[in-house]
Swiss-Prot record:
Residues 386-395 have a biased composition (Basic and acidic residues). InterPro entries: ECIST_C (IPR029342), ECSIT (IPR010418), ECSIT_N (IPR046448), TPR-like_helical_dom_sf (IPR011990). It is found in: Cytoplasm; Nucleus; Mitochondrion. The gene is ecsit. It comes from Xenopus laevis. Belongs to the ECSIT family. This is Evolutionarily conserved signaling intermediate in Toll pathway, mitochondrial. Residues 35-56, 377-410 are annotated as: Disordered. Adapter protein of the Toll-like and IL-1 receptor signaling pathway that is involved in the activation of NF-kappa-B. The lineage of its organism: Eukaryota, Metazoa, Chordata, Craniata, Vertebrata. Its main location: cytoplasm.
Length: 410
């Protein structure tokens, strides 16, 4: 009923219901002739991009590989902190910076990590009452700070007092990032010196010094001596081209020299490799000179139970005393005795042949012993077979297209 009353009242208020013509209500606008015209226009084209100073551009296009360094990385963080005092989008900025730190070479810089934590607004995420302390207050910001500490833990970076001061100023003393910081400070000093053979923080850039350090790490005998058989140098040929000669560094101990002197000259020795050795993120390769195990030294293994009830052999050194000096024993391996090791610039037989000729000065028996090279495809030779495999594929595709060409000609 109410809707019906509203309709009746609206009808009485309309100009037609009162007997007033519609043209008079329009006034002078009704005197204009009403015409209908057809207007055609071209459809709008695609939006044109205008290069302005305020346009957004991704950082990967702004910074080239030569410009990706610590100073530019810190400059971006400073520009963001000065632009907005409220630090809107600080979580996204920090997470993006964590992903790009290896590209800028600052993934092991403690100062940069403290700079990332300084991006957080101060004294905003600290809980003010017991209810906020019960729950995870500002969980996204706390998880972001924990990710920063986890990346520091991944690269083995120990936090300092400035890191603790920033976390206290941002999240308070009972937050999850502070607990993560306390766990890191508890375990990091305990595991810092567990490795008896620590790798230096900066590896030597000289390949000869790097090979010398690596061979000393591989060799178990402290009496082993390193010999540089060839230094890297470049030589100009008669035709004007430059020929590069790579380095050869070898190592051999006195016990290995005596083992090689007692080797049968009729039995060949083998040069095998390359074998990888990782020093942090750097991978180097070494080669060994070895022989097959002596079949006369293979002893029959005694069963454990038979040896327990009826001992057939006892390995007891009765002549030893507590005052005897312990010396390094020769390790008997299943593959056979290892006589020497070396590191070379490439796995070429010609280059390794120079190493064998250098060993003949201290091991004259090598001049009478046949040497067999058992070399695998090294890292420098991996790209060559891929190019060779691509050529037969093109030939096969051309052979498959030949019948189609004959059909088209017919």
């Amino acid at each position: 009923m109410r809707t019906l009353r509203f309709l009746l009242s609206a009808r009485h208020l309309s100009p037609r219901a009162k007997g007033i013509p519609v043209l008079q209500t329009l006034g002078h606008k009704a005197q204009r002739p009403m015409t209908c015209s057809l207007h055609t226009s071209q459809p709008p084209g695609p939006p044109q991009t205008t290069s302005s100073a305020g346009s957004v551009a991704p950082y990967e296009d702004v910074f080239k590989k030569e410009q990706r360094n610590k100073s530019n990385f810190v400059e971006v963080l400073d520009l963001y902190c000065k632009r907005d005092t409220r630090r809107r989008g600080h979580v996204e900025i920090i997470e993006t910076a964590l992903r790009w730190m290896p590209e800028f070479g600052v993934e092991k810089d403690l100062e940069v990590y403290n700079k990332l934590l300084d991006v957080f607004p101060k004294e905003i995420f600290i809980p003010q009452n017991f209810i906020q302390r019960m729950f995870n207050h500002y969980p996204r910001q706390q998880e972001c700070a924990i990710r920063v500490l986890e990346q520091m833990e991944h690269y083995g970076i120990t936090p300092n007092k400035q890191t603790c001061f920033l976390l206290l100023q941002i999240f308070g003393d009972r937050s999850h990032p502070i607990k993560k910081y306390q766990r890191m400070m508890y375990w990091f000093p305990r595991f810092k010196y567990t490795n008896p053979f620590p790798v230096p923080a900066e590896l030597p850039a000289d390949p000869v010094e790097l090979s010398r350090m690596c061979l000393h790490r591989i060799a178990a005998d402290l009496d082993s001596r390193v010999a540089v058989h060839q230094m890297p140098y470049t030589e100009k040929c008669d035709d004007g081209k430059e020929q590069e000669h790579l380095h050869i560094v070898g190592i051999q101990s006195p016990s290995q020299v005596s083992l090689l002197a007692a080797h049968d000259p009729s039995t060949p020795v083998y040069v095998e490799g390359p074998f990888p050795l990782w020093l942090k993120k750097t991978c180097v390769y070494y080669y060994i000179l070895r022989a097959d195990p002596d079949p006369m030294e293979n002893e029959e293994e005694i069963d454990n139970e038979r040896s327990f009830y009826y001992p057939l052999s006892l390995d007891i050194q009765l002549d030893r005393d507590l005052g005897d000096d312990d010396s390094f024993d020769v390790d008997d391996v299943v593959e056979g005795p290892v006589f020497a090791m070396c590191m070379a610039g490439s796995g070429d037989e010609r280059l390794l042949g120079k190493w064998i000729r250098g060993l003949q000065e201290t091991n004259p028996i090598l001049g009478q012993t046949p040497v067999v090279f058992r070399l695998n495809s090294g890292p420098q030779e991996l790209s060559v077979p891929q190019e060779k495999e691509a050529q037969p594929k093109q030939e096969v595709e051309e052979e498959e297209r030949e019948p189609e060409r004959h059909r088209m000609e017919q």
